[in-house]
Amino acid sequence: MALKDLLSTSPDQVRDIEISEELLRQDLDKYRELIAYWRMYPDRLIDYYCSLNPDNRFHLFFYQRLFLRCLMRHKVVYATFVRAWSKSFMSVMGLMLKCILYPGAKVFTVAGGKEQSAQIVSSKIDEICTLIPAMEREII
């Protein structure tokens, strides 16, 4: 099955198929290839999640795509941006993608105080899940 076929599978088609261990093992190499692709191009995963919602109005700008790719490809990223660049939003989205694509990953965020950090992350997660409902289904 080609990547194009995997991406074009509608949620209705997926619901009709019972997922068994046999079925997963049969296509395991394809899933690994798809996950490796999304690790290099996390913005494409966001595009895929957005395509699942017919009423989607969210899209990434070029510089946001670039920032997400940098976050996923490099261990340490230092960036300075102007006001209203969506720094917190993109950072939290990057952390969420890292947790989705690297199960068991330990991630953290830093702010002036513990409560402030928790408040920022919580509000951004809520905002992301409102804009991209498929991301909410990834949270346990």
Label the predicted regions.
Residues A2-I140:
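Phosphate/NTP-binding elements of NTP-utilizing enzymes
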